[in-house]
Amino acid sequence: MNFKIKLIHLYFVLTFGLFFMMIIPPIAALLEQNLIAEIFYNLNEPLCHQYIGRSFCVFNNGMVGDCEPSNEVNAIVSTEFNYYLSSKSKLAADKFDGEYFYNRNLVGLHRAEKIEYNNDIYGYKFGVCSRDTAIYLGLIFAPLIYFILSKKIKSTPHILFAVLFLIPMGIDGLGQLLGFWESTNVMRLITGLIAGFGIGFFLYSILVDIDKKREMK
């Protein structure tokens, strides 16, 4: 029996592998599985800056949302949205062991910050930032859209197809870098999804074409 591993299968292994690497750390931290959380936060570290102010958190009430409350919300009901970070030596830098009030200057200095609110709600960030989270989701959903449109696709998209989908993310990121505006997690989510889908659709279509040619040999 001549069995060939299809490249599209490797695509799914890679994309879903990245997805699970992203969601395991906060869930493990919430379940107090500190070693597992530490391992997966460290695995994600080379892939992302992991700034908590630019990340989504999984909270102990089952909700997913911004780790850092917006300034508008904080200003309106500041007494209800007092929050601070708590780190453990297994999950973060040893010099920040214990509890301390949130300081914007400390953002990104460690990986598994614990956001706590004074209404007993707390959570941990995903393994990667909000934009990377969206990119991973876009990579996963791209094959589904390809499958739906497969009968209408006559050839592999040009590389400019992928480049066009990167433009919104590039504009958002460059504008923030140059100080024209401060992006939000919603904008990072939208532009990341667009970029992830464009890259995923382009790569997946190429892999499908290669697999078809391999089967014809």
Residue ranges and their predicted role:
Residues E32, I121-G123, G170-G196:
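Interfacial helix-loop-helix junctions of multi-pass membrane proteins
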Residues G138-L139, L193-D209:
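Hydrophobic cores of alpha-helical transmembrane segments in multi-pass inner/ER membrane proteins
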Residues L31-F126:
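Extracytosolic (periplasmic/ER-lumenal) interhelical loops and adjacent juxtamembrane/interface segments
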Residues V128-Y146:
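Hydrophobic alpha-helical transmembrane segments
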Residues L7-L35:
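N-terminal signal-anchor transmembrane alpha helix
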Residues N2-K4, I148-T156:
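Membrane-interface helix-boundary motifs at transmembrane edges
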Residues L14-M21, G138-A142, P157-L177:
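Small-polar-interrupted transmembrane alpha-helices in polytopic inner-membrane proteins
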